[in-house]
Each structure stands twice: as structure tokens, then as C-alpha cells.
Amino acid sequence: MSQQRTKAQQDIERRLLEQALQQAQQSIATLQMTQQRNEQQLRQSELEQRNLHSQLAANSEKLQQLAHWRNECEQLNQELRAQREINSAQEAELREVTIRLEETRLATEEKQRLLLNSEQRLTTQFENLANRIFEQTGRRADEQNKQSLDRLLLPLREQLDGFRRQVQDSFGQEARERHTLTHEIRNLQQLNAQMAREALNLTKALKGDNKTQGNWGEVVLAKVLEASGLREGHEYQTQVSVKIDQTSRMQPDVIVRLPQGKDVVIDAKMSLVAYERYFNSEDDAEREVALNEHLSSLRGHIRMLGRKDYQQLPGLRSLDYVLMFIPVEPAFLVAIDRQPELINEALQHNIMLVSPTTLLVALRTITNLWRYEHQSQNAQRIAERAARLYDKVRLFVDDMASLGQSLDKAQLSYHQAMNKLSQGRGNLVGQVESFRTLGVEVKRPISPLLAEKACAEHQPEGDLALSDDAESGAFPE
């Protein structure tokens, strides 16, 4: 009996345990479902949190950009207010000058009117005085009246002429001063407009994109080249397109020609956005960040320019380095002052950093090298021309010596011929003159001096032989 109760009790306990187990399993399933829902909610919460963080970061960036643009707008507004103040001051000065000009013109017109009235009154008084004088001295001789009137009116006429000249000189001087003042005001307005345009261009260039900054750098580079004395198209060329292969070309900003066929390339596409932030920022932390970005921009441009390898371009006999031009002098100085090792880093990439001042010194040196080269070439040409001239003179001297020898030979032949003609025994002149003594008639005789000298040296044997010949009938009478 007790065993049956024990077994029944065990069955009851087993059923209770099974029920408890089922309840526990149901509780576990419920807890697992709850856990899954909680995990899903947790993942959704994390996703929402990440979205919120992203939105927060985007909003923070927008706030920073908004603050940056607000600062830029404030700076531009300050510049605009300053420019407006300058314009207002200049307009006030212009109004003041205009008022002074108007007052001067009115005063001049009043002076002119008073002078005309005075001249008219003086003329009337002179006429009345002349009339009274003529009336009082009407019975005097006309010549005496005329002389007296001239003596009386001549000083007054001279005074009037001098007064008129002074008035004319005063008007002329005032007109010239008015013209000069107007010209200076116009120049002041033009200078103000030019300064405003240049300031606006510089601001746009520093705040613009890389293309705009590159164009600004090329403008500054062109001014430095112009100041150096080099000539475009002769000692330097701009925007030369160099063909590398069938599909690619490179176009350096400037190629400067050196003596002896060498070249040097100048690049002017430096970005100065970070330097603009450094220059305009008033916060030291922002200035430090902008300065580091400026240095990083310099290093990046050095590496990019080194990869272009301009000094190895085909058709160029370039030096082993390229000049990297930084168009704003303070941007160059602040970088070198902060990190002097930038110069050595650039040289390792075959790059030499230059500012407007250092580039101008280098270009002036190149100008002097070209001047010396031209002088050397001129000296070489002079030496070549001198050598050719010396050869010409030598040939001329040789020809003159040959001509002298020919003249000496001709003179010797002349003397020999003259000796045969009029000197010595049996000379021709003496023989033909003997024909005259024999009665031969001639139209014109030979020169008496030559004939006398020839006859004196002529031997009488010739005459005897000639007489014998005559007796023999060779020369009949």
C-alpha cells in the first residue's frame, strides 16, 4: 500500500516537474523572443544613433562652413565698407575741389567784370579828360595839342596795357592751374579704380580655384620677366607645347633660353588657398592649421612637379632643375621661415623654389649672361672681319707689289725702247732725221729736243754709208 502511494506521489511529482519544465521552456522561449526583440531594437537604436552621429557631423561641418563663409562675408563687408569710406572721402574731396573750382571761377568772373567796368570807367574818364583838354587848348596849335595829349595819355596807355597783360596772364595761369587740377583729379580717380580692380583681382585669385590662381601666377611671372629685360620670343617663350609621344603633350608655363643652347623651365601654377586662410585668419590655432596646410600644399606641388620631369622633355637642353615660382613673396618667406628644409627637399626633386624677388635676380643674371654672350659673339665677328680684312689688305699689297714690278719692267722696256729710238749709235730718230738733210719733205717734224739729242749721238759713219748709197742710186733725188 505504501509503495502504491509512493509511486502515485512520484507520478504526481513527475507530472508537476513536466509541467514546470514546460512552463520553463515556455518562459525560455518567451525570454528568447524578448531578447530577439531587444536585440533588434538595440540594432535599430545603434543604426539610428549612427545616423544621428552622421547628421551631427554633417551639421557640424555645415556650421563650420557657415562660420567660414560668415567670416569671409564679414571680411568682404569690412573691405567693402573700407572701400566705401575711401570712395566717400574721395567724393567729398572731389566735391570740395569742385566747390573750390566753382568759387574760383565765380571770383574770376567777378574780377573780370570789375576789370571791364574799371576799364570802361577809365576809358570814359580819359575821354572826358581828353575832351576837356581839347576844349581848354582848342586854340592852340594842333601839333602841340597832339604832342601834349600823347605825353599825357602815354603813361596811362602803358599802365592799361600792363594791367591788361596782367589780367590775361592771370586768366591763363588760372586756366592752366584749373586744367592741371582737373587732370590730377582724373588721374586720382583712375588710380583709385585701378587699385580697386587689382585688389579685387588679387582677392579673387587667392580665393579662386587652382586655374584662377595659376592664371594669376602667370600674370605676376609675366611682369617679372618684363622687368628682367628679357624679350619674349627671343630669350624666353611662353606656353610652349612639347610632344612627348603620339598621344600626350606637355606645356610648361615659361622656357627661358640660356647661352650655349641651354634652357630652364619655370612653373607658376602654385595654389595659395591655405596661405589666404593663414593670412586672413585672426585666430592663432586656425593660422597654425592653415600654415601647415600651406606647407603640405607646397610639398604636394613639389612632388607633382618632380613627377612631370620637365628637365627631361624631348627637344629641350634643360638644366638639371626646374624653377617653381611662388607668386606671392610673403607666402614664400613664411614657408621657408617655418621649414627651411623645404629648399633641400625641392632640390632632391630637381626643383628650385623662387619668389618674385629671387626670380628677378636670377633673370637679371641671365640677362647679363646674354649681354656677355652677345658681346662675345660681336667680338668673334669683329675678329673674323678683321682677319678677312687683313687677308684683303695682304692681297692688295701683293697686287701692288706685282704692279710695281710690272711698272719697273715696263719702265725698263720703255728705256730700252727709247734707247733704240733716240740714243746710241744708229738710233732710229737720227737715221730718219738724216732724211730731212737729204731733202725729204715731211708734214710735221719730230720734237726738236729729241731730234737734236738723237742726231748728236748718231754716228757720222751712218751718214757716209747713206751718201754712198745715194751715189749708188739707192735714194734718187
From Swiss-Prot:
It comes from the Bacteria. InterPro entries: DNA_recombination_RmuC. Keywords: Coiled coil, DNA recombination. Pfam families: RmuC. Residues 458-477 are annotated as: Disordered. Residues 1-211 form a coiled coil. Belongs to the RmuC family. Involved in DNA recombination. This is DNA recombination protein RmuC homolog. The gene is rmuC.
